[in-house]
Amino acid sequence: MSGQAASYYNPSQSYGDFQPGMQNPQQQPDYYNNNVSNHGYDLNFQRGPEPKPPTEPPPTYNQAVYGFDDAFKIERPKYHDIWAGLLFIAVFLGYVAVSGVAIHRYAKYKGLNGDGIYDSSNSFSLDTNTLILFIFVLCVALAFSYAYFLGARYFSKLFIWVTGILNIVFALATGIYYIARKQYGGGIVFLLFGVFAIICFISWIPRIPFSAFMLQTSIDVSRKYGHMFIVSTIGGLVAVAFAAWFSVTLVSIYVAYEPSSSGSNPSCSDGGCSRARVIGLVVYVTFAMYWFSEWLKNTIHTTIAGVYGSWYFWSQSPNGMPRGSTRGAFRRATTYSFGSVSFGSLIIAIINMLRQACSVAQRNEAAEGSIVGSIMFWILGCFIAILDWLVTLFNRYAFCHIALYGKAYIPAAKDTWTMMRDRGIDALVNDCLIGPVLTMGSVFVSYVCALLAYLYLQFTKPSYNADGNFTAVIMAFAFVIGLQICQIFMTPVSSGIETIFVAMGWDPQVMIRDHPDLYYRMIQVYPRVQQAIQPSA
């Protein structure tokens, strides 16, 4: 593999070329064709000639020290998708401005909203009671997310089983609880979710050994190289801090601009309050929150991908890993690739906004007892979730390419997906459960946060929610906070696996030459590795 930016992989390399002295596993037939009986490939299919990446080592390879930028050089222009980076900065600055004004108005009339759970005289909007709820939600999300991260680190196979079972049990128990509380719409939705989780988990069982092996491989590498656990902890704490800031901003917007029918909101004495303004500002800060959270998540992912790429291509070289791989990968993600990371994050943020709107609508229908409406919005939410999964999958493998070679977002996505499809890596990706497992675990944490919000509102009975109008909104935001924090904590776990898959596709011969033990254990656990990845005829 080159130490220089590469837009193409070498289709002539395969996993069937062994070095002398290695035990040669039983040869598999050549599956790399487009015939239906041969995994959808045609025996007569031939790729046109593609330029091979240069094979020379980085300029300082034989010297005492070389860094990440020497190992993975990027071509000019070095900066890509600049418009997305500038737009991201503008949106974030707008968020800072809105937050500052809203929090100032909240602090100015804080007496109306109380200092604790029960002493508020605010009967028209969110208040300090809600702020304390979000503090509890943050603590629960932080504790569950970090415990989940430690579970992945120390109990790889058990981690997958426990995740699936907990989601099933929690979904069914929540559905039964809602029905017992006569919230039939929400109860039926959760029961359907539980049945769906059971079907998914049963289909997972044959693929658990391979997934557990890949997870353990990622964890083993992280213990020896890079700073995965430090990056995860710092990223998680930044996510918690931003979620706290967002929670204060959200409550402040309602306090500052929510009109009161009795005219009791002192913030509205000088005008400027309206329901439309509240909705507009909430939509804006929610979108900014999603975009920042996705950018943070993808920056962590790109950083970790750089570390695993360094391990895959250079750990067995005479001079070992490039010096400062973690710092070098982070520096590239926040400079040359800042625009590309912002672009990919923007797409996910838009989809998440649609899913959030659907979630709020579904909970409103459930609160009003509309079973049909609740189920319809749940089904729509499932389609949006599938779209989110597909785009996220597409994004994360593209970011692995961006981490190493610094290409623009769209060319990197096209090149990476073409390579993975032609190599057969997409088959391995589909059979690896780590992505769905981590998503399911994050959803579990978010449902715990949403349930906490519901119980808190039921037991504290704030005056602003006497008719239950704010229940769906508060639960939805508690769900989002739990989901984003857990996903950010767990990002480094999946990043290693995804980078290994991409690196295997770009240069499979490195796996044979530099990591033979890993390769042989992989084909023992999952023989389809030899069948899925073959050179073209």
From Swiss-Prot:
Subcellular localization, as worded in the UniProt entry: Cell membrane
Extracellular side: 103-130, 180-184, 249-275, 355-370, 454-469
Residues exposed to the Cytoplasmic side: 1-81, 152-158, 206-227, 297-333, 392-432, 491-537
UniProt KW keywords: Cell membrane, Glycoprotein, Membrane, Transmembrane, Transmembrane helix, Transport
Residues passing through the membrane, by range: 82-102, 131-151, 159-179, 185-205, 228-248, 276-296, 334-354, 371-391, 433-453, 470-490
GO biological process, one term: transmembrane transport
Compositional bias segments (type: Low complexity): 23-35
Compositional bias annotation for Polar residues: 1-16
Entry-listed glycosylation sites: N469
InterPro entries in UniProt: Choline_transptr-like (IPR007603)
Protein family (similarity comment): Belongs to the CTL (choline transporter-like) family.
Function (record text): Probably involved in transport through the plasma membrane.
Protein name: Protein pns1
Gene: pns1
